[in-house]
From Swiss-Prot:
Keywords: ATP-binding, Ligase, Magnesium, Manganese, Metal-binding, Nucleotide-binding, Protein biosynthesis
Residues binding Mn(2+) 2, per UniProt: 260, 262
Superkingdom in the source lineage: Bacteria
Needed cofactors: Mg(2+); Mn(2+)
Family: Belongs to the RimK family.
UniProt name for this protein: Ribosomal protein bS6--L-glutamate ligase
Primary role: An L-glutamate ligase that catalyzes the ATP-dependent post-translational addition of glutamate residues to the C-terminus of ribosomal protein bS6 (RpsF). Is also able to catalyze the synthesis of poly-alpha-glutamate in vitro, via ATP hydrolysis from unprotected glutamate as substrate. The number of glutamate residues added to either RpsF or to poly-alpha-glutamate changes with pH.
Residue positions binding ATP: 141, 178-179, 187, 211-213
E.C. number(s) listed in UniProt: 6.3.2.-
UniProt cross-references to Pfam families, sorted A to Z: RimK, Rimk_N
Presence of keyword Ubl conjugation: no
GO molecular function terms listed in the Swiss-Prot or TrEMBL record: ATP binding; metal ion binding; ribosomal S6-glutamic acid ligase activity
Chain sites annotated for binding Mg(2+) 1: 248, 260
Length: 300
């Protein structure tokens, strides 16, 4: 097969591993910067051009689209979909997962347990907002934040009011969430491919922090997950219609709680921690579906 990887930086670990895994299985691979793709949207002869040339047909596309370029990145991916390329995560699913509010609404609708969460743009009554989510301590986040950026733990009511008021001055959407103290700065990242959790790690925050993101200096170890956690991770990925997803789970006293569903999970931390060839599993998923179900679905 001919496979395109959409990424702004082909030197990143995940891109290199996906390229390597695809080549090892006999496929042709090209890494394309989605921002350098430009599209001819024409009912008679749609096409995609890249750095002065018309791109050939690709059997499959692997989107590694960063949050900052979601709008144009998913537009480029849609064009590949229009031309019959199988996407490892469809554009609509990526856009849905990037909308944190919509994601949580969809997960809640499916009965998937979440931390108690409030979202607001410009709260007129900060005190009522804090009461609504159960009071301090609580976590205040910018909806548009990623990798732990724009996330603050407010341990007292006064601190929570100050943080919310400060964020309100940024004219941003604010997410206010209960703090799961018993998780002790740890979460579980489940890597879902299709209908299987192929790997899981526990991420622990560095000392003095509560954010377990590896990009923020957190540490990782292999996690043994329960059948309930496995089921919830798969259900969360299905709810978001993602073939590949990183599902982040907190272990609370009342049971596992889904924190986030990531449409473009990094492979470095989880592959190096577990030793599992996740990139290879993603390529095998493409082999299974790019040549059968998707062609039937799109008429390709």
């Amino acid at each position: 097969m001919k496979i395109a990887i959409l990424s702004r930086d082909g030197t990143l670990y995940s891109c290199k591993r996906l390229r390597e895994a695809a080549i090892q299985r006999g496929h042709l691979v090209e890494i394309l910067d989605p921002l350098s793709c430009y599209m001819n949207i024409n009912p008679a002869a749609s096409s995609i051009h890249y750095k002065g040339r018309k791109l050939p047909h690709f059997d499959a596309v692997i989107p590694r689209i960063g949050t900052a370029i979601t709008f144009y990145g998913t537009a480029a991916l849609r064009q590949f979909e229009m031309l019959g390329s199988y996407p490892l995560n469809e554009s609509v699913a990526i856009a849905r997962a990037r909308d944190k509010l919509r994601s949580m609404q969809l997960l809640a609708r499916q009965g998937i347990d979440l931390p108690v969460t409030g979202i607001v743009h410009s709260p007129d009554d900060t005190s009522d907002l804090i009461d609504m989510v159960g009071g301090a301590p609580l976590v205040v986040k910018l909806v548009e934040g990623t990798q732990g950026i724009g996330v603050v733990l407010a341990e007292t009511r006064q601190a929570a009011e100050s943080v919310i008021d400060a964020f309100r001055g940024l004219n941003a959407h604010i997410l206010v969430q209960e703090y799961i103290k018993e998780a002790q700065g740890c979460d579980i990242r489940c890597l879902v491919v299709g209908d299987e959790v192929v790997a899981a790690i526990e991420r622990r925050a560095k000392e003095g922090d509560f954010r377990s993101n590896l990009h923020r200096g957190g540490a990782a170890s292999v996690a043994s997950i329960t059948p309930q956690e496995r089921e919830i991770a798969i259900k969360a990925a299905r709810t978001m219609a993602l073939d590949v997803a990183g599902v982040d789970i907190l272990r609370a006293n009342r049971g596992p709680l889904v924190m986030e569903v990531n449409a473009s999970p990094g492979l470095e931390g989880i592959e190096k921690t577990t030793g599992i060839d996740i990139a290879g599993k993603m390529i095998r998923w493409i082999e299974r579906y790019a040549t059968t179900e998707y062609c039937l679905k799109t008429g390709g």
